[in-house]
């Protein structure tokens, strides 16, 4: 296995769009798709953004010893679970790219080690992030504003300065100008790929 480039950031930081654009510019990176029990959103595709599964499938993977890390969020719509499974995606020699949370990054770092897991933390000023989140939610057929607010507040705790420091996150990519942010990330990944 090559390196795993792991994108993270608070909700509405632009990480999903950045992830897609980085994959376009670096097609040699293979993707890791994580799992979730939450409902699929408009515009998402099963197996692309996430594998959308139910609790029964999660239990099967747990019993098979395949779940690397698991997070549960008590949302206003019930408990949503997100997890990474060692389901064959990590068996390749390719460099990989994934998207997740700081919590999942810490667990994956324990599983794979510092040498293999490269953090890419995307930062956006909170006011701009809230504005983006609200615009995105308004476009949904059934906007979930309460959940948007819960996520926004939870992110403040989940991505606190102390937690970023404890996780060893020292570099931040500021997403003020998305094209510039993407260029910086692509350059950083290319440099790390050369030192494998």
Q: Where are the model-predicted features located?
A:
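Walker A/P-loop
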Residues: 15-16
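P-loop (Walker A) phosphate-binding loop of NTP-binding proteins
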Residues: 10
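Conserved phosphate-donor/acceptor-positioning beta-strand/loop module used by diverse small-molecule
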Residues: 96-101, 112-135
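Hydrophobic anchor at the beta1->P-loop junction of P-loop NTPases
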Residues: 7
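ATP-dependent small-molecule kinase phosphotransfer cores
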Residues: 38-96, 100-102
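Small-molecule kinase domains that catalyze NTP-dependent phosphoryl transfer to phosphate-bearing small molecules
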Residues: 139-189
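Short beta-strand-centered segment that lines the nucleotide-binding/catalytic pocket of NTP-utilizing
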Residues: 28-41
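Pre-Walker A (Motif I) flank of P-loop NTPase domains
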Residues: 1-4, 93-94
